[in-house]
Swiss-Prot record:
Keywords: Ribonucleoprotein, Ribosomal protein. Residues 131-140 have a biased composition (Basic and acidic residues). Belongs to the universal ribosomal protein uL13 family. The keyword Ribosomal protein applies. Residues 129-151 are annotated as: Disordered. GO terms for biological process: negative regulation of translation; translation. This is Large ribosomal subunit protein uL13. SUPFAM superfamilies: Ribosomal protein L13.
């Protein structure tokens, strides 16, 4: 009978990464971020434990989408009251709350349970180029979202 490997919690080293979202494709960027938050890039990945790293996303206001998604992609939210459905296009939400676009995309790629909520707290998204996490000494992470392009 095989036994699931459990890495000791003391040995888990959580790194901090900073990702620049300028001109990056939203979905491809979000899937890479979700993989790092989950810890799938590490040798001691365990599905039911939080083994991932922290990710800081800067320049969320400059994230890119392809095709007509800028005008046709809709984000919906509901207040819980009758007739309380609010609909907003990608372009309007990007003007109003650019962080929410990246957060929404990454959250959809994480587990839909308590572990997913815990992983989501390790994502920090900022609209502009600055962030308040310099004390953590984050490493620059370059994510190539354009297939075949060198970066």
């Amino acid at each position: 009978m095989s036994k699931t490997y459990l890495p000791p919690q003391e040995s888990l080293e959580r790194d901090w990464y900073v990702v620049d979202a300028t001109d990056k494709r939203l979905g491809r960027l979000a899937s890479e971020i979700a993989m790092i938050l989950r810890g799938k890039n590490k040798a001691h990945y365990t599905p039911h434990l939080d083994t991932g790293d922290f990710v800081i996303v800067v320049n969320a206001e400059k994230v890119a989408v392809t095709g007509k998604k800028r005008t046709q992609k809709l984000y919906r939210r509901h207040s819980g009251r009758p007739g309380g459905m609010k609909t907003e296009t990608f372009a309007k939400l990007q003007q109003r709350l650019p962080e929410r676009i990246v957060e929404h995309a990454v959250k959809g790629m994480l587990p839909k349970n308590s572990l997913g909520k815990q992983l989501f707290t390790k994502l920090k998204v900022y609209a502009g180029p600055t962030h308040p996490h310099d004390a953590q000494k984050p490493k620059e992470l370059n994510i190539n979202t354009i297939p075949g392009a060198e970066s």
